[in-house]
Amino acid sequence: MNRILFHSLTIPPDQVSTGKLVAEIASKFKEKNINIEILASMPQYRFDSSEFTNEGFKKISGNVFVSTYKGVKITHLSSSKRSFSRVKRFSQWISYHLKSIIYLTKNRKNFDTIYIFSYPPTMNLIAIYSKKILKKKTIYSIWELYPEIAQKLNELNSNLLLGLFKKVDNFCLKVIDSVVVNSEQLKEYLIRERNIDDKKISVIYHFANEIETPKSEKLTKEIMYAGNVGTPQNLESFINIFSSSKKEYKLTIYGSGSQFDKISDYQSENLIVNSFIHRDELIKQTKDIPFALVSLSPKITIEGFPGKTFDYLKMNKILIGYSNPDSSLANFIEQHNVGINISPNEKNLDSKLDIFEDAKVVQQIYQNITYVNNKFANIDIISQQYIELA
């Protein structure tokens, strides 16, 4: 029997969408009687060591805990609360990788195939180790492409380091068995710019395996945003054009991140900024908000696709994208007609919002949201695509 290991940084009870996706996919492997376990960190975002025991964590050594998720065993490696400092965050990644390598080496006889999920971007080091040293079948799922994102956002200004990272990443993608990406555009980029064999690249979309919540009863002029508040999200730019709107929309933000304090300074009658809250509470507080903002730096095109897109759709929110018109996000919104995309170069926000004054257009968008939820947020379809790679 093929013994599978999923390796991720985040996993429930961390309230991080990517970690929840990994856990849900693993649970579907388990339902099909596939031998599967997960290796992840201890919670970094919702961190309270006093609560670990209450949430089903069992300490088996100084740095190792175990828990279960829908019958899937999870081994957690100890970690500290996520830092928003770049230097500290990088050191956290490396520390986690070292612990992972020790664990994988000690337990290499317990698994045959390893699925590695790409955040952080340095997970490529583990993928290389898995394939070249441990000789395991290795599938690497890329949700954001580095160093391209770091370069475009000026997060790494050393050409030497950028070149070195790209060489390491390319080596990883060429030696492993399969690569998973979340858009056709990213697949085409890897083939064209990175010379990766198209036969080893599979496109599997993000999804949100949550219960679909009812749409808001009224089409009020309210927009929500929930998630990371950092440089890639480009929220400050959206707020600047939002503040010039005469449509009297209200924007409510729920989040945390490196730009949170700065964004909080913009609070006004029409802009409310709240700290991160859990999804159940988020649904309660936003049930009457019909629109959701998905904001992305205009420098990012195919390199990243916000996972919250599908979470918003499961909440039956009409999407307001704020991204480069050539981005995978803009392409998705417009191709499936689940909202609008606004270019960061747009000078007149109100002219874009006019479309929502047509009741027939809004009705069609809601129908399209239902279609997309059934097609792209179907956990059975998504998990089967991953199973076929094993």
Please name every model-derived segment.
Residues M1-G62, N240-K246:
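N-terminal subdomain of nucleotide-sugar transferases
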Residues T105, T122-L125, Y129-I133, N159-V179:
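Membrane-proximal helix-turn-helix segments that form the acceptor-binding/catalytic region
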Residues K166, N170-K200, A330, Y386:
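A short, active-site helix/loop in glycosyltransferases that binds the activated sugar's phosphate group
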Residues S216-Q233, I239-S243, L251-T252:
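Conserved donor-binding/catalytic core segment of Leloir-type glycosyltransferases
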